[in-house]
Amino acid sequence: MRFFATFFLLAMLVVATKMGPMRIAEARHCESLSHRFKGPCTRDSNCASVCETERFSGGNCHGFRRRCFCTKPC
């Protein structure tokens, strides 16, 4: 019985370490269509740099029409 309890405790410890650290809840991000980006949005990095000039924290290309959407924490 003692062996089983030790084995069970070690198994639980291994399972707990495999789960990894708890994630902290992330802030929500608000999106807005960029007013200064021109042309089709093909690279997220170009979109993000234009959005930073519009006082946003970043930007991504979205949708079928590949438009630039700026993001910031709400």
UniProtKB/Swiss-Prot annotation:
**GO:BP terms for this protein?**
defense response; defense response to fungus; killing of cells of another organism
Task: Name the cystine pairs.
Answer: 30-74, 41-61, 47-68, 51-70
**SMART domains named among the record's database cross-references:** Knot1 (SM00505)
What would be one Gene Ontology cellular-component term for the protein? extracellular region
Report keywords, A-Z: Antimicrobial, Disulfide bond, Fungicide, Plant defense, Secreted, Signal
| Predominant place of localization | secreted
The cellular location(s) given in this protein's UniProt record come to: Secreted
Question: What is the annotated tissue distribution of the protein whose record heads this document?
Answer: Tuber.
Per the UniProt entry, the signal peptide is 1-19
Q: Name it.
A: Defensin-like protein P322
Organism, by scientific name, is Solanum tuberosum
